[in-house]
Amino acid sequence: MLMFVVVGTLALRKPCNAQRRPYVGVVGGVSTLSADAHTDLDSNSATTSSYKPENGPTVGVFVGLHWNNYFSIQGDYLWNRNLVTLDSLAASTTATGARLYERTFQSRQHTALGSALLYFRPRSSWVRPFLAVGTGVVHLTAEPRSAGIANGISPPGSFSATKPALHVAMGIDLKLKNGWGFRYSFAETSSSNPISRQLTPPGSRMLANFRNLFGVVKCF
C-alpha cells in the first residue's frame, strides 16, 4: 500500500520531459466466468440450482493517452462468448419423483470501460508493469442452444441485461521498435449477476469475468 501511494504521488506530479502521447491497441485471449449455486432445504423438500460456465474467446480494442511517465487514461471495448449450462432439481417427501431441468445457453457480453492506469516504471523503460482501475457497463445476452431436459420445472428462455461494472487489471507493457509494444494483462470485471436470477431458486453471487489478454500496442 505504501508503494502504491508513493508511486501515485509521483504520477500526479508534472513531468519534466514526458509529453502526453496517445496510443491504441488490440487484445485477444480467454474469458472465464464465475459460477453460482443455491440450495433451499426444509423438513419436507429440497431444491438446488446452479449454472456452470465454460471458458470462451474474448477480443477487445482500446485507445488511451499516456498523461506522463507513470499515469495513463484508457477506454476499452471488450467482447466475449461463453457456453453456460443452467440446471435445477427439486424433491419433496409429499410428491412422487423429482422435478428438474437442464439447458445450455450461448452467452455473449459487450463491455465498455474507462480506466486509469498507474505504471511503476517510466516510459523510457522497455518493461513497464501497471495496475488499472475503472468502471463501465456490461451488456449480456443468452440464447438457448437446445431444448434441453425438463420435467416439472420450466427452464428459462432467452434473457439479456445491461449492468454497471467495476474493472480491475494488472499487466505489463514490453517496448518494441518504432512505437510498437506487446501487452499482457489479467483483468476482472464484476457486475450484478443476471444469470443467477434465472436459476430456480435464484443464486446470489456477483458475476465476475476473468480475462487473460495478449495484444499489441501502438504509441504515436
Language-model features: where?
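Cleavable N-terminal export/targeting peptides
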Residues: M1-R20
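Gram-negative (and chloroplast) outer-membrane scaffold detector with strong preference
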Residues: Q19-P22, T32, F62-I149, N209-F220
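Surface-exposed strand-loop-strand hairpins of Gram-negative outer-membrane beta-barrel proteins
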Residues: S31-V59, S158-A161
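Outer-membrane beta-barrel translocator domains and adjoining extracellular loop/strand segments
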Residues: D36-N44, T85-S92, T141-G152, P194-P201
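Extracellular loop and loop/strand-boundary signature of outer-membrane beta-barrel proteins
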Residues: N44-S50, G97-F105, N151-S158, Q198-S204
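Short sequence motifs at beta-strands and strand-loop junctions characteristic
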Residues: Y51-P57, Q106-T111, S158-A165, M206-A208
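Predominantly the C-terminal beta-signal and adjacent terminal strand-loop region
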Residues: N82-L86, A95, L176-F220
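Hydrophobic alpha-helical segments of small multi-pass membrane proteins
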Residues: A112-G114, L131-V137, T162-I172, E188
